[in-house]
Every structure is written in C-alpha cells, then in structure tokens.
C-alpha cells in the first residue's frame, strides 16, 4: 500500500483495530463524525442493504499520482455490514475481484470524483485494490491534486473484552473482541 491513511472511530492496522494509533505515535483516534456514519447508513440502505449497527470506522486514504493499493479484503471487522466507499479527486482504476483469490477473475472499473460504491452480501469479502490513479482527472473546482477515498465500515467491536489500557509503554496491538 502506497496510499497515505488516517482513521476515524477506530484505527486500522494490519489484522486489527484499536482506539489508539498503535503502529504510530500512540495518539487516540479522532471520533467518527455522526454525519459521516449517517452517510454510510444511507448509502447502504439506498443500495438495498439493511444495516442495524452504526458505521463507526472511516479509513481515509490519500493517493498521489504514483500511489497504489494491492488486492486485499476488508475482513478485520466483526460485522458483515456493507463497505461504503466514497471517491473524491482524481479518477482511479478500481479492481474488484472474487472472494477466493487475489488473482483473476476480476473487473476493472473507473471510480471518478463523487462516485460512491457499496459492496455487501456475498461480495463483502471480495478482494479489491487500486492498481493506478489517473492524474489530472479531478474536477478543477475541487482544488485537489490526487485522490481521496473515504471507506466507511461497521466494526462490530465493543470496548468490553478488549485489551486493558497500558499504564506505560506502547499500546497493545491486540484487536478488540466482539
């Protein structure tokens, strides 16, 4: 992954979530804005998915002209609620694959500024990635060079049963339990 990322609600790090930036400076994660959680729920509903829990994670990725994201699955959440993805800025090639492997078959789709993609149900765990960004394709009125992607998820996590807050030293890297 060469995109730069920050998180709201829960901090994602490979294979887990935490309330602090465990693989960075240890700072607390900023709260998920209620309006952004509501956007996730409205998008999922408009796509025909009933979501009972609140969207409580936003992964905000910035892609410059050379950034990429390899094929991966959004599988660290305990919830099966759909993933909601909002694109702003430069167009990207979004590769949407299958649920078994990172390789073919997959479909390449251009995501443009303002596009909103919802994937849930059987496709919730499909491998997907961004093999390239198309520089200079952002709407000029946006004033943005590069691409911002806001990915909204429902964690299915609770504070209870998670690791205790450390007294000293680096925070625990263990993911919280459902």
PLM feature segments, named:
Residues 1-178:
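Non-heme Fe(II) oxygenase metal-center motifs and adjacent flexible, charged/small-residue loops
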């Amino acid at each position: 992954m060469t995109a730069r990322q920050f998180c709201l609600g829960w901090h994602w790090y490979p294979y887990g979530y935490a309330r602090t930036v465990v693989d960075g400076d240890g700072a607390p994660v900023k709260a998920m804005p209620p309006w952004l959680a509501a956007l996730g729920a409205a998008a999922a509903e408009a796509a025909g998915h009933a979501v009972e829990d609140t969207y409580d994670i936003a992964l905000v990725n910035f892609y410059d002209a050379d950034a990429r994201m390899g094929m991966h699955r959004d599988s660290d959440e305990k919830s099966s609620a759909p993933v909601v993805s909002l694109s702003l800025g430069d167009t990207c090639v979004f590769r949407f694959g299958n649920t078994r492997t990172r390789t073919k078959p997959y479909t390449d789709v251009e995501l443009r500024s303002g596009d909103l993609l919802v994937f849930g149900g059987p496709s919730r765990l499909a491998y997907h990635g961004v093999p390239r960004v198309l520089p200079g394709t952002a709407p000029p009125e946006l004033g943005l060079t590069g691409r911002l992607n806001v990915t909204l998820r429902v964690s299915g996590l609770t504070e209870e049963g998670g690791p205790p807050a450390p007294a000293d030293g680096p925070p625990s890297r263990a993911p919280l339990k459902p």
